[in-house]
Amino acid sequence: MRWLNLLFLIFCHGLLSAQCVSVSGFVKDAVSGEALPGATVRTMKNATIGLTTDGNGKFLWTANQSDSLRVSFVGYEDAVVVIGLACEIEVKLTPSFTGLDEIIISSERLIAEEFTMSKIKKLEIYTNPSAKADPLLAVNALPSATTTDESANISLRGGSPNETGIFLNNVPINDAVRYGQLNGIGTFSIFNTALISQVQVYPGNPPLEFGNTASGLIALTTDEMIPTKAIHTVSASLASVGYYTSRKVGKGAALTGFTNFQPSGLLRWFNPVALERIKRFNTVDLGVHFFSRLSERTALKIFTYANRESFLFDSRTPTFRGNVNQEKARSYTVTNIRHRFRNSELSFNHGLSFSRARFSQSTLDAQLDLTDFYTSLNYQYFGTKLEIKTGLSYDYRGSNFEGKFPRYRYALGEQFPVDSTASRQAIRLPELYLYGKINLTPKWIAGGGVRKGISTNEQSGFLSSQLNINFRPTKPWNFILSMGRYNKMVIPQGISAESTQIQTDQYSLDVSHTKQHLESALSLFVKDGQQGDQQTHLRGIELYGRYRIHRNLRTQLSLTSLRARQTLKGETISSPFDIRYFIRGNAEYKFGDTWTATFVFLFREGSFYLPVVGAHFNSSVGAYEPIYDRQARLPNYSLIDFSFSNLFAVGKNASAVAFCGLSNVPNFKNVRDYTYNFDYTLKTAEYYALRTIYFGVVVSF
């Protein structure tokens, strides 16, 4: 009997030892395997008790063997798990759509996907303080980004923003920025992050399945999720109030709508010094997205968007100090239809866009109307080793500019002479393309293609071509060699009345090494271009490293160096992107299960400008005309940002993320340009954004 009692005690001790004080859990997408941060975990006994997963999709639960947990996440089916004796549990949530065929046609894969360098996920856009929850600003955090003006006009690897192609669902989006000036520079993009599922970035050698792109390419894709129940999201921050909803319509369709209002009052009140020059801004936008699986193999996607914005800021020039007013209204619609055959796919893409912008500053009073029409038909074959994609496209871009403007750039006051102009220009660009990719061996992939621009009455034809090679000798290593010639027709805007062609020759070698905790990459690239009489020559190198020190701490560091020259009429000077170093990095720390703190920095060499060394008084005009010296560099640029966020449950069926960001924490005075007094004897520095605070909350239910 004593032996039985002893065995019983040993057995009970084993059971007690097997029960964990706490249980660690991991929640992920059942299809893609990706972690799901912000998923809600609650006990079945009491729905008011719960927590949310951290930024890695993990959670820690105080163990109780009898506990049953309900795990939920917006856009996914709920899952119920019993803890039992497990110390670790993995929860797979199924996306809210049904049927294997539906999953097969749920997204369109780029044929040149193996030659991409960067993919940005939705969560990365929200958690990066430099991105300000904007998809295009998130691109500026990449090592390949060489944007120097803190705007959403993206430069990649030293290319002009005019050379960068931006596509939404395979349709080019021109003028994709808000608060844009007459020169095209804009502060934010027009894209709603809540609707974007992924951003793919080609820093150079853009795939020729996309047309009219001369340098880098940014491809955005909207979500194709069909929720089983209605999804609602309400957001509020210092500069915006928004509402987003998505619901299932019929058997296999989803209808999504959103609207945002962005006033400037609160943001300016919290940041009176940093935003001293901004008098007012506001935006109202509305978007509707419809996705339908018309059949097991056919999908339809329609997205329409409209916005109205205004921007008033203080301008200071030698001959005028006063307000600059900008107003703009625009709308666009993107339609996609694709049908999947057994080993191939046929797709049709269409885009239509209209915009009207008005600018006024002293005697400048101008209106710019832009019209874009795009359509393409594509066929893609999926073989075991060979993939081929071919198609044709037609791209129309029209510009209508009229107004009055100062006759002399240095005489902007109302007392100086003005000229009036009216111009109407357009480009019509039909193109044919063919791209093929072959898996030579399990380690080698080769791709290549051509794209022919057909000549019209407005412009001559051109031929673009490229070659890509991907080599994976072992699992952690990846080598990508790319080269090609690319062409782009630039739409005329503003006073400029002639469209121009940009042609670039590019060569790049990208090497990456990825292990469990360490990612590293090296890129070497060469780019030679021509636009009109101007030639550009660029050489560059990128170094990148990303290391997870432990479960809660991740760091990233990159160095980009550019040597860029431009030649015009026999004279060679440094280009605006001749910058010897961009040093950027970040550190992300997760604590308390749901809190995340992020530290971001950027240091770069100052860009070039033309200093004024004197002035000549033009008596016929009544103003001083500046005399410029040779190029000089602005002071070096430094930026440090900090943000933190918290994921938490709200009530029984909702979750929220609260965030707060502080930009330019040390309040660096980064010089953007210089302004002068009337006779150019006194110089004053103009600065980029000073220290700025921004916070808000997003609630999903």
Q: What annotation goes with each model-predicted range?
A:
Residues 28-32, 39-44, 72-76, 84-128, ...:
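Short, acidic, small-residue-rich periplasmic hinge/interaction motif at the N-terminus
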Residues 47-58:
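Short, acidic Ser/Thr/Gly-rich low-complexity loop/linker segments typical of extracellular
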Residues 77, 87, 110-164, 170-206:
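Periplasmic N-terminal accessory/gating domains of Gram-negative outer-membrane beta-barrel systems
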Residues 91-92, 188-229:
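A beta-strand signature from Gram-negative outer-membrane beta-barrel systems
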Residues 264-267, 276-281, 298-374:
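Flexible loop and strand-edge segments within Gram-negative outer membrane beta-barrel domains
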Residues 349-351, 357, 472, 500-542, ...:
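Membrane-embedded beta-barrel scaffold of Gram-negative outer-membrane proteins
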Residues 439, 525-528, 533-613:
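Gram-negative outer-membrane beta-barrel transporters
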Residues 605-617, 639, 645-701:
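C-terminal beta-signal and adjacent terminal beta-strands/loops
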